[in-house]
Amino acid sequence: MSANDIALKVAADAGRAAQELVLGLMSMPWGQVSPSVYETGRLVTLAPWLTGHGERVRWLIDTQRSDGGWGAPEGYGLVPSLSATEALLSVLRRGDDTGVGAETLREAAARGLRLLSRCLSGAGLSLPDMPAIELIVPSLVMLINEHLEENGMSVPLTLPVGMSAAPLEAVRAWVASEAEIPQKLLHALEIAGDAANGAAVAHVTDIGTIGASPAASAAWLGDRGPSEPGHPVRWHLEAIVRRHGGPVPVGLPITVFERGWVLSWLARAGIPFEVPPEMLADLRAAIGPAGTPAGAGLPPDADTTSVALYALALLGVPRRPDSLWAFETPTHFCTWQGEEGSSVSVNAHVLDAFGQYAAVRPAEAARYAPAIGKLRGWLLERQREDGSWDDRWHASPYYATVSCSLALHEFGGPAAVPAVRAAVEWVLDTQSEDGSWGRWTGTAEETAYALQLLLFAGGEERVRDAAARGYAYLLRVADVAEGPPLWHDKDLYRPLAVVRAAVLAAIHLAQSRSLGVRPISQV
């Protein structure tokens, strides 16, 4: 069966594919996440005793770009390139037996250093807004410069213009003092250096993770890793490295996050599927008075909480969204208290949660009307001149734009109509010749977002023509598991089931609008 045959079969039975996807969430409850260069590099340095060390080193070699860097274009490549280069230098310094020749390691590290030197010495480097980047970059630059000094190299790497090591030094002193630190910092505990080893500020979760991060967990376990093979954190790390044969994701588990997004994408599109009762029960139980985290080891956040609430309301088991008040500020809703910056996608999802609950519980709608009005106004103020939105939790403006546009289309009222129309026009104007959409190149994920916006909010012939071209592109991309990571964490990542759900939602919407789809009986 050809790739196109597979794609057509999936398109013709999106409902069955959605059902299989939902059931698959139960069999992999920690979530399905792509491996991360940054996180894998940290395990190479911090945990050479962990199963799969050689495989991790080989994976770093194999994923190096032709220019010597790692990761996505633009400033997104800095953190993974720093991590991978430092990891290879650590392997060379220790003389690890990894199955990769020393000359191969030296050449890869040298290419990484040359790229980093060029990148960091230039004034035009623009860094993305990603968690802990202001701590991660200085910590890795310090480690690399220690390697260079040991090797007698007199030209150290510099920090990007405008970045200082002072915040990192303050956090390290904070961790060493054993004073309580914000839970979100535990996700990047590895930046604390020696102070992370056994840090009293960290608490091991029931599943053995520190901060839902393999790197943070390995840093905390420290020198106990090889001597205590039965330690819960060691067991947790061993379980994670087996998922990808050595490399590791940047964050795990993402149980609530994954389930909320998958269920809401599918339900919003109207795909018929059944949810295991225990999954709905778990999702309801996860939402406490202060909200819910994406997974064990993370702090509660408004994004995961609102999407879970929205999914529950769509699926007929609404829960009062009062836990979201914990994230309200005078102007908008924060991802978590103390957030530096703000997120349009988070506020769009909060609007979804309030709006959908008010729709299914109209007797309580007045309670949430002021917040809905505030959210609408805040989102409208942040639309860019071209009609799009951008966001701190995703590299693609198509994700931010579909999040804001759909929330405003459903719950923003007449005042939001011009903004949604402008977003539709932006999507129409940015379609590629092959029918796809994408920030750097066309992807199934971003095309699915664009299609959903067009099919929910558009209607005229020009919209139908563009949507038909986008749908045809999706049919040609049979394996949606392939594609670049676009979601923001310490490194870019790809939540596979979430992306799959978004694509299935777009396919189903295209089918329901009869965009040139053959009847199921003919496929």
Predicted region positions:
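Nucleic acid-processing catalytic cores of prokaryotic defense/repair systems
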Residues: 65-70
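An alpha-helical repeat/solenoid feature that recognizes helix-turn-helix modules
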Residues: 1-12, 28-55, 72-98, 118-187, ...
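A short, surface-exposed, charged and often Trp/Pro-enriched helix-loop connector in the C-terminal portion
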Residues: 107-108, 473, 520
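Edge strands and adjacent loops of beta-rich recognition modules
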Residues: 187-201
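Helix-turn-helix repeat elements of alpha-solenoid scaffolds
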Residues: 14-19, 192-195, 327
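A short helix->beta-strand "capping" segment at the edge of beta-propeller domains
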Residues: 13-25, 199-202
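Buried hydrophobic core positions in alpha-solenoid tandem helical repeats
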Residues: 21-22, 60, 112, 116, ...
